[in-house]
């Protein structure tokens, strides 16, 4: 294609070697500045992809298996549409002779148009984290939160990161040492989709394979999505003895250990861990080891030793309980000002968690410290060299950055700072004008910004060189939980501003590096990022608000009909976190007044574990597998449980092992050609059928009542086993 063969005139660009070997092997050192970028096709396909992915991902977010449809689906799907538009759209110019002159069809569909469309799609595929705030307040706390402040919070949390991206782009994008490994997958896919495709021995192109996969997965999802929902979670062990609590605990894929449980549903497989087809085998192996260690060693051991009164509660649950084993009525300990009612809390008693939930919180602590120490121990020397090269006065400019600076105008820093200033002003306005609904004081917004400013370059260097990014959610919850306790909405707003603004800035920086690799004009990339983010936020907010009005008892598992998919597991965990860190506070949970203070030792364990692996690799250099142990991945594997359950892991691991090991090893050519295309087709087909089923049948409550839609068949998996505990629907020992 023209984009990859028309080189700039300076011969040194062909001779200069990229600092990172992977970049040298993957990214072309060529550019065609005349290639179409901002076109009618780009706007139509980009905004359509952004809105569609935003709607689908928010739609799935409230479901039991919240499938995330990645931008890869759109990245592949728009190729034939783009080529079709290049053939059929008129080529005449509109408003010719004016500054607004444009043509709907500037020629062949270009790679640069495709990259910008994918940037729009990235905005739609990345969840708007602040929708959790809307769900927690309106659906769980049953309190008032108007649409305007909710929308403003969503917009500001998503866009605030532009400020940090502008401040640190010189250090985290321009240097060759900052190579952002995940972008190389995107670059490879762009090249595969645009460079001339030789006929394969299977007689089918990537686009044809994508269409076949999409139609097949679309048709198949009619079974697990409507006609035969038991395929979502097949827990056959429970069928042997459905009234035995022990058998139910062992066999339930949704509320137990999930031994032998599996799902024949793509949304079950890919909902929490992402597509198993995109996971490297070493990462899948670490996830498998972590899952088996936590689920089949630590959890049974803690439960049957009755640690933290484990038998009084379900073996697996993300809910909160009182000491007697009944579900905690959080609304009963909130006063009229939406703060903790201390007297009511003293009468109700402390908040209790299932031991599994407590352990996974500990694993979250450990993952944070392990991520930092793993990178320092295993990548410290290279990291220091790369950081000095990036932040030093004599930093060497990357060859691709040289090409960009030669051919295109930079984005002025004041563009980024203007967005930051406007955002900060809006945030202060929200904090003051909507104080009773948001609770966050203005100084809390500034503190959240300071945390994000401090951690963005640190985490950014780690992410740009190792593809690992420790989250800030626990740190932010801890800080505001002590600084401004007993205010749940303030806690989750602070967490979102501190954590998500940093996370978003890393996304923006990653996209800027992708633009450098693919030679997208920086100002055009900036425009696509800003517009895509705003469109995505509006689409996410509108979809969430519509679903709240459309679905009766959304997220309320006590009132939803049996087998309902609208259980909102992710929002439930977010709500519980707001209770633990915000309403009750870390001091009453993990501090000197809390029952779970020993969980803090996980911070220490997470810091020590990478050092032990490093020592083992030095003591036994011939054991190559030791160096493949990645502690943050291993112990962080189950940090998403809950809301993820055992069946999500067992099903995912099987698929990851098949495609990441067997197919990759023994059918490498097929894997290279079709693996990511298969993943994108499965995402898209499942997503489209799910929405169609809802609009055509489930919205009108048209259901089929038969045993295939009666759930997994583990009715007592959530029952306690302690003596004398009375829970509705459970036997008393």
Swiss-Prot record:
One Gene Ontology molecular-function label: oligopeptide transmembrane transporter activity
Cell compartment(s), UniProt: Membrane
Keywords: Membrane, Peptide transport, Protein transport, Transmembrane, Transmembrane helix, Transport
GO cellular component, one term: membrane
Transmembrane segments: 42-62, 66-86, 115-135, 147-167, 209-229, 244-264, 281-301, 357-377, 413-433, 442-462, 531-551, 596-616, 644-664, 677-697
Main localization (coarse): membrane
Pfam families: OPT
Topological relation to the membrane, as annotated: Multi-pass membrane protein
Matching InterPro entries: Oligpept_transpt, OPT
GO annotation, biological process: pollen sperm cell differentiation; protein transport
Role of this protein: May be involved in the translocation of tetra- and pentapeptides across the cellular membrane in an energy-dependent manner.
Protein family: Belongs to the oligopeptide OPT transporter (TC 2.A.67.1) family.
Name of the molecule in the record: Oligopeptide transporter 8
Gene that produces this protein: OPT8
């Amino acid at each position: 294609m023209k984009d990859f063969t028309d080189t700039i005139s300076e011969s040194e660009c062909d001779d200069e070697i990229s600092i990172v070997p992977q970049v040298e092997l993957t990214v072309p050192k060529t550019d065609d500045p005349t290639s179409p970028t901002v076109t009618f096709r780009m706007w139509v396909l980009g905004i359509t992809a952004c809105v569609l992915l935003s709607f689908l991902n928010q739609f799935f977010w409230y479901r039991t298996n919240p499938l995330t449809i990645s931008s890869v689906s759109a990245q592949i799907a728009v190729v034939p549409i783009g080529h079709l538009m290049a053939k059929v759209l008129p080529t005449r110019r509109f408003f010719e002779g004016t500054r607004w002159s444009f043509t709907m069809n500037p020629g062949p569909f270009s790679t640069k148009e495709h990259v910008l469309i994918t940037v729009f799609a990235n905005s739609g595929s990345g969840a708007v984290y602040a929708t959790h705030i809307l769900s927690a307040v309106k659906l769980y706390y049953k309190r008032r939160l108007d649409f305007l402040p909710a929308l403003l919070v969503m917009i500001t949390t998503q866009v605030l990161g532009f400020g940090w991206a502008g401040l640190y782009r010189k250090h985290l994008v321009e240097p060759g040492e900052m190579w952002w490994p995940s972008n190389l997958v995107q670059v490879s896919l762009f090249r595969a989709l645009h460079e001339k495709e030789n006929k394969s021995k299977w007689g089918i192109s990537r686009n044809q394979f994508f269409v076949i996969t999409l139609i097949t997965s679309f048709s198949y999802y009619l079974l697990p999505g409507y006609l035969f929902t038991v395929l979502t979670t097949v827990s056959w062990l429970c069928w042997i003895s459905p009234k035995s609590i022990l058998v139910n605990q062992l066999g339930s894929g949704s509320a137990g250990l999930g031994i032998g449980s599996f799902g024949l549903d793509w949304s079950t497989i890919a909902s929490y861990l992402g597509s198993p087809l995109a996971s490297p085998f070493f990462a899948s192996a670490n996830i498998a080891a972590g899952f088996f260690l936590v689920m089949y060693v630590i959890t049974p051991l803690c439960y049957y030793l009755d640690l933290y009164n484990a038998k009084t509660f379900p073996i697996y649950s993300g809910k909160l309980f009182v000491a007697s084993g009944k579900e905690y009525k959080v609304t009963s300990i909130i006063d009229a000002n939406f703060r903790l009612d201390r007297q009511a809390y003293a009468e109700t008693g402390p908040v209790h968690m299932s031991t599994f939930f407590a352990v996974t919180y500990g694993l979250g602590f450990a993952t944070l410290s392990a991520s930092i120490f793993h990178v320092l121990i295993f990548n410290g020397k290279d990291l220091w060299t790369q950081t000095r090269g990036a932040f030093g006065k004599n930093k060497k400019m990357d060859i691709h950055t040289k090409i960009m600076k030669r051919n295109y105008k930079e984005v002025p820093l004041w563009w980024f700072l203007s967005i930051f200033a406007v955002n900060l002003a809006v945030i202060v306005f929200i904090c003051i004008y909507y104080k009773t609904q948001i609770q966050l004081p203005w100084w809390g917004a500034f503190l959240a910004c300071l945390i994000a400013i401090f951690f963005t370059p640190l985490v950014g260097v780690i992410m740009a060189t190792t593809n690992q990014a420790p989250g800030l959610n626990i740190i932010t919850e801890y800080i505001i939980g002590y600084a401004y306790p007993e205010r749940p909405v303030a806690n989750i707003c602070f967490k979102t501003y501190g954590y998500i603004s940093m996370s978003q800035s890393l996304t923006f920086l990653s996209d800027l590096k992708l633009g450098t690799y693919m030679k997208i004009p920086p100002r055009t990339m900036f425009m696509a990022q800003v517009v895509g983010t705003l469109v995505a936020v509006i689409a996410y907010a509108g979809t969430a608000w519509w679903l709240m009005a459309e679905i009766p008892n959304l997220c309320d598992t006590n009132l939803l009909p049996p087998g309902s998919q609208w259980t909102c597991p992710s929002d439930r965990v977010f709500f519980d976190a707001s209770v633990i860190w915000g309403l009750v506070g870390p001091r009453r949970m993990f501090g000197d007044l809390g029952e779970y203070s020993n969980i803090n030792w996980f911070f220490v364990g997470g810091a020590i574990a990478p050092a032990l692996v490093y020592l083992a690799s030095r003591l036994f250099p011939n054991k190559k597998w030791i160096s493949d142990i990645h502690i943050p991945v291993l112990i962080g594997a189950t940090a998403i449980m809950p809301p993820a359950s055992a069946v999500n892991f067992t099903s995912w691991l099987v698929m990851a092992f098949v495609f990441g090991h067997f197919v990759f090893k023994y059918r490498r050519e097929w894997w290279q050609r079709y693996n990511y295309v298969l993943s994108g087709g499965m995402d898209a087909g499942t997503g489209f059928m799910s929405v169609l089923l809802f609009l055509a049948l489930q919205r009108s409550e048209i259901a089929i009542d038969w045993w295939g839609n009666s759930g997994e068949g583990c009715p007592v998996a959530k029952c306690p086993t302690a003596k004398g505990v009375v829970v509705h629907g459970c036997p008393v020992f």
